[in-house]
């Protein structure tokens, strides 16, 4: 049976009962040329543990884009980061739908069978998984709908195409049921500014005294709290349409709900009364143990004491029952203190941020480092500068070629950070998710035209909540400590929410205890001018826009407080220039790149070995980038390459007129009115006389110029056959 639905700017075609018919629920979904299979399977036996055993796996098949997997093994193997992050998005969106007490192992598999470059795979995959789950015999009463919102040319766009998203200032992904929001992912997308800004570049046509760095600016496109609410409101309306459309279309095709048993809520009023009467202060003392391991140890001791009491033995209370009731009692104390007393377990008010300490460049041989400590959460964040060859190469189904990512963020969470002796493993979904959030928060502040590849690593040394946001703060300062001129500092804070009846409280800078016993985890990161990234997960059925707005504005207060402390730390940074890589960026005639490479790469290999440098070449633009540990060797390699191109130019008949024209008749102070022959990233070339040009560096340009304009200039310097100009 086939069903076609037009909703939220796209036509979705569903095939029901056509494939995977032995699954509990399955659907084949098509949007344009994208085809996705979503299947749900459930075991008949419950697990003994008290948790929801749900597994979500999003899988991309390379044949979906007409490709054969690369590498030695010609088949799909370990999931990539995009697959893992998409699996996490689907899991976080669907997990709240399952009824309380549901303990049957359940698997949701989403396979991309055909990929259209213009179709958003994350939106399609979540909606396909949602419909498959809704059609199954699992007791899920309403389908989730996921939408993406862009902001293009000042207007919000629902479900933009992939090419449209590249021109968007906003990437907002929201999932919900009807008018209830369940999950939010957001990032701002930077773009180049149109106006001319001061840039210092390295180029053989420039005055060498100006070759001090390579700086560009772009618009970070942070979003204000009000604009963010407008975007989320629009997404909520689209979710309502989508959720209603799915329910109406598939209500009559939903399987009969299976006759399942649910784990009963363990309740024993007598145990709770006994704990409240004799152990209330002990539980409060345990709550005040901020470390997770210490708190768990204290609660375990209390449970053992109660189990050994005469009352417990007489009433038949075993330790498992007591521990369960004790956990609920602890949660009640935490939440009651927040709602009624406006006080938290560590004595803070609802809006208070924990004490913060910041140290920078504590690692002498690292390019940049920051030890950021907030309460009992501590992140050591380290930045390393590399070249284009160090960029992370990734393949995406929707991209024809591999994508080079020059900004990488890795998040590591060892067990000792929470006092646990757990084995060190490869990063899991949580680590990838936290690292991705920190990367999204910091990315808009990174120069898009930076000649460096940047790798930021966050080592969590202590954790009691908000470790990902500590990584954002530490990462922003770590970049500055490595000499990276980010546009603005970026800070992050984790917000919480507690609902009790008609009352609620929004918490700033939540601890692990408040994350566990609260109703919301809402991470907000941004600069002094707005939000660059946020992530929200709701444990309730949903959240209203009014409460969300309150949380956003409360987060802004905390962010401003943290940024003020970060500004002070930034002013005290001493960059360790000795360990930073030295870099030269210059241009040659693109046709001479082949001479630099040499036959079978012989010449460039000799240069790399002789001068101990790394070299990146852009064949199309003629750009040469040399990086190394010693400036003398980098400069020597640059001179050597220029000699190669000059040698080839003279012997082969090529002549760079701008470089070899006779400049002897020119003197410093000579004044000219010349035509702008060429605009470059680093300045304007002005025609003087006799075919000779001079360079007006961009740092001396005070108003926009264009080729063909006439401008008055005077000679400021003559070096190496090149003329530098000032405005006259």
From Swiss-Prot:
Q: Where in the cell is it found?
A: Cytoplasm
Specify the enzyme's EC class, one word.
transferase
Q: Which Pfam families match?
A: KH_1, PNPase, RNase_PH, RNase_PH_C, S1
What's the main place this protein lives?
cytoplasm
Its UniProt entry gives the catalysed reaction(s) as:
RNA(n+1) + phosphate = RNA(n) + a ribonucleoside 5'-diphosphate
Out of the domains of life, which is the source? Bacteria
Under SUPFAM superfamilies, the record lists: Eukaryotic type KH-domain (KH-domain type I), Nucleic acid-binding proteins, Ribonuclease PH domain 2-like, Ribosomal protein S5 domain 2-like
Record domain KH: where: 581-641
Q: Which residues form the signal peptide?
A: none
EC number(s) in its UniProt entry? 2.7.7.8
What are the required cofactors?
Answer: Mg(2+)
Q: Which family does it belong to?
A: Belongs to the polyribonucleotide nucleotidyltransferase family.
HAMAP family registered for this protein in UniProt: PNPase (MF_01595)
UniProt function note: Involved in mRNA degradation. Catalyzes the phosphorolysis of single-stranded polyribonucleotides processively in the 3'- to 5'-direction.
Indicate what this protein is called per its UniProt record: Polyribonucleotide nucleotidyltransferase
Protein source organism? Campylobacter fetus subsp. fetus (strain 82-40)
Traced from the root, the source organism's taxonomic lineage reads:
Bacteria, Pseudomonadati, Campylobacterota, Epsilonproteobacteria, Campylobacterales
